[in-house]
């Protein structure tokens, strides 16, 4: 398949079966779910450790555990999505998320805190991008990339909206009360939105294109799928490690902490800009070509960040460029299954594809920090991560179905 409207990926659903409220509702719930369940933690973690005496390593490990649970849970969630649609999955996920955030807020000890985060990982699998992408892919058919772009643009605002809100609440409330307030917001916004806006009939899966393997199992065991999974996993590791290590890299290069933080924030703005360009890119390129190119571009920006000594404004520009590539890569992964194997088994296959990527993202911050010392600094770490991205790009060459 070489374009967005790959005929074998058509769902057969028309505008009549498309719930009008689903897209705006998912935009709002992605902002809220990501903002509360994910982005509130880095804002509150210093207060949590100061209040409880738990180590930063221990609290961060609990958070990473949630990401690992999300990766593992995403596979069965994908199967349910394929069969039954997103309403029950995402509504239940919101309920679990509220319970988990309240449990985090009132955890009396580190073990309870960790258990609450593991429960939050289940909520992540049922409410974050994966189920939203599955819903939009089935309902929007050949127009899915437009819908996916809109919801990822909205999701990119989660940190913009909830990081300052969380910080503001924490200035006046304890971290526990702040989390309790956020849990109420999560309940009020996401539970009714998922329960009411996703009520449309779930269209039957389209038939598998005749030239492709029959059944999701055959696809999942195929060489192109395994190479694609390996490529995206390596890229995910490099991408998450770069994001976490960007601020210390820039401070090593002479940027003050405020400027380095702004560079990270502007990189997020670059992600949003990059996502607006993906539809045009996908129309003009074959799926394997753009996969290889975007992974290579990601490695290129990482290499430049690792080798260009300055000045700081140039490094900020490179951070924005890296963000633009990351924004495209989000949509590349969202459409990787449909552009190659159609929508028939999207939920399960995308869950299988996302699981190792999520695990890599959970491991990357710790691995990056552990490697920085032996390698001799963040510049050397970025050079290594660029090589990892280059390997990912080479693996992606073989991801085209036969």
Residue ranges, per PLM feature:
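Conserved MFS/SLC helix-loop-helix module at the cytosolic interface between two early adjacent transmembrane helices
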Residues: 72-110
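Helix-loop-helix hairpin linking two adjacent transmembrane segments in secondary transporters
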Residues: 142, 151-201
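A late C-terminal transmembrane helix in Major Facilitator Superfamily
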Residues: 340-375
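Cytoplasmic helix-loop-helix junction between adjacent transmembrane helices
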Residues: 117-153, 342
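Extracytoplasmic gate region of multi-pass secondary transporters
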Residues: 41-45, 222-276
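Helix-to-loop junctions at the C-terminal end of transmembrane segments
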Residues: 73-85, 274-287, 372
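Extracytoplasmic
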Residues: 21-56, 74-77, 163, 242-247
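C-terminal transmembrane helical hairpin of 12-TM major facilitator-type secondary transporters
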Residues: 267, 271, 285-336
């Amino acid at each position: 398949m070489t374009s967005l409207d790959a005929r074998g990926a058509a769902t057969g659903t028309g505008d009549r079966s498309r719930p009008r409220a689903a897209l705006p509702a998912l935009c709002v719930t992605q902002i809220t779910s990501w903002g509360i369940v994910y982005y509130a933690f880095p804002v509150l973690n210093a207060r949590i450790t100061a209040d409880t005496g738990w180590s930063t390593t221990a609290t961060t490990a609990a958070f990473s555990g949630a990401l690992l649970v999300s990766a593992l849970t995403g596979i069965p969630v994908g199967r349910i999505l394929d069969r039954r649609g997103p309403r029950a999955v995402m509504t239940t996920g919101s309920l679990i998320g509220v319970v988990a955030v309240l449990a985090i807020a009132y955890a009396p000890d580190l073990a309870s805190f960790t258990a609450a985060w593991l429960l939050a990982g289940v909520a992540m699998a049922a409410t974050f991008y994966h189920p939203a992408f599955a819903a939009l892919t089935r309902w929007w058919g050949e127009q899915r990339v437009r819908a996916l772009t809109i919801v990822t643009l909205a999701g990119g605002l989660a940190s913009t909206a909830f990081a300052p809100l969380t910080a503001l609440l924490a200035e006046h409330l304890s971290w526990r009360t702040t989390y309790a307030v956020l849990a109420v917001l999560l309940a009020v916004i996401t539970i009714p939105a998922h329960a009411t806006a996703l009520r449309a009939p779930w269209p039957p899966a389209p038939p598998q294109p005749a030239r492709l393997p029959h059944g999701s199992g055959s696809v999942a065991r195929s060489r192109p799928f395994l190479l694609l999974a390996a490529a995206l996993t390596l890229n995910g590791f490099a991408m998450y490690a770069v994001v976490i290590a960007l601020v210390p890299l820039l401070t090593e290069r002479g940027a003050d902490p405020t400027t380095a933080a702004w560079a990270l924030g502007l990189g997020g703005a670059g992600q949003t800009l990059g996502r607006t360009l993906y539809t045009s890119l996908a129309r003009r390129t074959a799926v394997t070509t753009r996969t290889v190119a975007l992974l290579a571009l990601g490695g290129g920006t990482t290499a430049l960040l690792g080798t260009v000594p300055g000045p700081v404004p140039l490094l900020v520009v490179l951070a924005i460029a890296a963000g633009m590539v990351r924004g495209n890569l989000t949509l590349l992964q969202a459409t990787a299954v449909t552009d190659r194997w159609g929508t028939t088994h999207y939920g399960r296959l995308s869950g299988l594809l996302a699981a190792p990527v999520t695990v890599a993202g959970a491991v990357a911050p710790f691995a990056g920090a552990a490697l920085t010392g032996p390698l001799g600094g963040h510049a050397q770490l970025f050079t290594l991560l660029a090589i990892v991205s280059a390997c990912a790009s080479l693996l992606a060459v073989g991801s085209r179905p036969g």
